[in-house]
């Protein structure tokens, strides 16, 4: 498979998002991030099971994007479906994160970088949408 500029965007974007999501999910297993995430979920009104589900979701999305990108040549027929599912899941995950940021009860000091406006989740959501767009363009060209 020849590397086109679109393929490179998809690959590098997937590696970045995968690393970002896995890292942040993994960090939430340790203090002080564990407590900060617990406060975010509790104050936003989401149920308690959202805490382990959120961590597992972030780590699995990250691993999905990283594994698809790293083993692209070996799993070429699975690359697009894995990146599609992980990117779509990331958009849902970041939609929930945006809602958490917008809850008035959630203090800024427990959010990433202490930033109350949802710049980070919206930026990540945009990058995940870029992945979906690149996959769509690639599929259109092949047919």
Predicted regions and their residues:
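Membrane-interface extramembranous regions
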Residues: 2-143
